[in-house]
């Protein structure tokens, strides 16, 4: 976790131009990973209380706490024993980042300090041309970032920031959006700032025809074109999944930073950035969850077009419904245990949730490679036409991450909702199911 004095780094790491790959060789990552295994999990409460002042101006209560922080920032060093001077915070960060600029990040942000050691009210990043207002302890103030000009800073941190001239125009999409006094642990502040890629995506999407759906593939191509232009070395090129979605984890290879994004828009999720390791991301996080119902509508299932796909989905839901009814009716069946059903769910929705819980042995929220095997056997045994079985699991895996979520399973089986009602139609009643007489449905015809 980055020290609080360096709360600019995640924002500015993405503003930096890519540096040669050899800066972060396999040996570098290996060394950092080994350090993490050894130091990052240290339990420090029982360590002797001997304060240390670090090179970034931060005071650590023990050597153990310092080592735990150093595993996240290998360049961190001990400046001297004892507490750091409060007024030297900005000065220490300035000295520290200047050293970083010489060693590793040539375009790292270097703060400006007042004579008393506090942060200057206006801070600028010379390479990108952006300036913004900060509080006396260096935190950015929301809505103050401007390009190639001096921002109008509020008289106090509680004063409402005046909106800058031209706000709301198209060129605002390129300005970094900074947090207003983030709450919580100061050490977590570093992970809350959007990356330059946020603004690149926003800017490119604004240029996309409003009548056409933007996709990661389009953004990827646009970024490649931008990267070819002069002085565009800082362009971040997104990684794409199947179907025009973004991969849930995006990284800036030259700096080692990674963060989670919304898979449908590519927007970074605040509080998720990490360095030298991949964050744990939600593979289904979306800005517009309601649109997920349309993802499978025109998605082709190889070897199973049109009416055949509809017949196949109906046979799968019929078989699953029958299995659930039999399992619930059999007192000796452990698979028949159902949690309290949602009264708004239709039979098909209950069936999918029941079967998903049955497959998700480790309760991880997705069905992995090993957990999916019973589903494949079920499809081969109880569904028809058989030609539709071969590629069905891949068809369900919308983001191509080798696992299936309950939303993906519902979507690929055609069990979706529209305007608060399940988008299903009347179908065959499973034997032995009294409840289904009032809930007989058929999946939406796809393809």
From Swiss-Prot:
Residues 147-230, 416-447 are annotated as: Disordered. One of its GO terms (biological process) is extracellular matrix organization. CDD domains: EFh_SPARC_SMOC2, KAZAL_FS, TY. Pfam families: Kazal_2, SPARC_Ca_bdg, Thyroglob_assoc, Thyroglobulin_1. It is found in: Secreted, Extracellular space, Extracellular matrix, Basement membrane. Keywords: Basement membrane, Calcium, Disulfide bond, Extracellular matrix, Glycoprotein, Metal-binding, Repeat, Secreted, Signal. SUPFAM superfamilies: EF-hand, Thyroglobulin type-1 domain. Disulfide bonds join 40-71, 44-64, 53-84, 90-113, 124-131, 133-153, 216-240, 251-258, 260-281. Residues 206-216 have a biased composition (Polar residues). Gene3D superfamilies: 3.30.60.30, EF-hand, Thyroglobulin type-1. Glycans are attached at residues 206, 362. Residues 87-153, 213-281 form the Thyroglobulin type-1 domain. Residues 347-382, 384-419 form the EF-hand domain. Residues 161-172, 217-230 have a biased composition (Basic and acidic residues). PROSITE patterns: EF_HAND_1, EF_HAND_2, KAZAL_2, THYROGLOBULIN_1_1, THYROGLOBULIN_1_2. GO terms for molecular function: calcium ion binding; glycosaminoglycan binding; heparin binding. Ca(2+) 2 binds at residues 397, 399, 401, 403, 408. Residues 34-86 form the Kazal-like domain. Residues 1-21 form the signal peptide. N-glycosylated. Strongly expressed in ovary, followed by heart, muscle, spleen, brain, thymus, lung, liver, kidney, spleen, testis, ovary and skeletal muscle. Its main location: secreted. Binds various proteins from the extracellular matrix. PANTHER family: SECRETED MODULAR CALCIUM-BINDING PROTEIN (PTHR12352), SPARC-RELATED MODULAR CALCIUM-BINDING PROTEIN 2 (PTHR12352:SF21). Can stimulate endothelial cell proliferation, migration, as well as angiogenesis. Promotes matrix assembly and cell adhesiveness. This is SPARC-related modular calcium-binding protein 2. The gene is Smoc2.
């Amino acid at each position: 976790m980055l020290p609080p004095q360096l709360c600019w780094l995640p924002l500015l790491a993405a503003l930096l131009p890519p540096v040669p790959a050899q800066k972060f060789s396999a040996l570098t990552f290996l060394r950092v990973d080994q350090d993490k295994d050894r130091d990052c999990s240290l339990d420090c409460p029982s360590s002797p209380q001997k304060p240390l002042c670090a090179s970034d101006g931060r005071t650590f209560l023990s050597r153990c706490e310092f080592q735990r922080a150093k595993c996240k920032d290998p360049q961190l060093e001990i400046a001297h024993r004892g507490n750091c001077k409060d007024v030297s915070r900005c000065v220490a960060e300035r000295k520290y980042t200047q050293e970083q600029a010489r060693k590793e990040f040539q375009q790292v942000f270097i703060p400006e300090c007042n004579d008393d050691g506090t942060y200057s009210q206006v801070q600028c990043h010379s390479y990108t041309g952006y300036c913004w207002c900060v509080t006396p302890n260096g935190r950015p103030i929301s809505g103050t970032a401007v390009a190639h000009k001096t921002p109008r800073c509020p008289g106090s941190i509680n004063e409402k920031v005046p909106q800058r001239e031209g706000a709301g125009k198209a060129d605002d999409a390129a300005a970094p959006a900074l947090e207003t006094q983030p709450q919580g642990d100061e050490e977590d502040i570093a992970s809350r700032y959007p990356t330059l890629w946020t603004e690149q995506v926003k800017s490119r999407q604004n240029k996309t025809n409003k009548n056409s759906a933007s996709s990661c593939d389009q953004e990827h191509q646009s970024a490649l074109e931008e990267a070819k232009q002069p002085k565009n070395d800082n362009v971040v090129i997104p990684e794409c999944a199947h179907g025009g979605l973004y991969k849930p984890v995006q990284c800036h290879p030259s700096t080692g930073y990674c963060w989670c994004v919304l898979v449908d828009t590519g927007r970074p999720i605040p509080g998720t950035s990490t360095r030298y390791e991949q964050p744990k991301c939600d593979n289904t996080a979306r800005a517009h969850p309601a649109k997920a119902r349309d993802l499978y509508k025109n998605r082709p299932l190889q070897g199973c077009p049109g009416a055949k796909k509809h017949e196949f989905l109906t046979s799968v839901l019929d078989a699953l419904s029958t299995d659930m009814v039999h399992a619930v009716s059999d007192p000796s069946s452990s698979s028949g245990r159902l949690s309290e059903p949602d009264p708004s769910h239709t039979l098909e929705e209950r069936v999918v949730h029941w079967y998903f819980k049955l497959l998700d042995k480790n309760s991880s929220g997705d069905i992995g490679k090993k957990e999916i095997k019973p589903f494949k056997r079920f499809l081969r045994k109880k569904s028809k036409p058989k030609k539709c079985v071969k590629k069905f699991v891949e068809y369900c895996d919308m983001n191509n991450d080798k696992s299936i979520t309950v939303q993906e399973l519902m979507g690929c089986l055609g069990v979706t909702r529209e305007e608060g009602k399940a988008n299903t139609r009347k179908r065959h009643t499973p034997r032995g199911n009294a409840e289904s007489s009032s809930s007989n449905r058929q999946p939406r015809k796809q393809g």
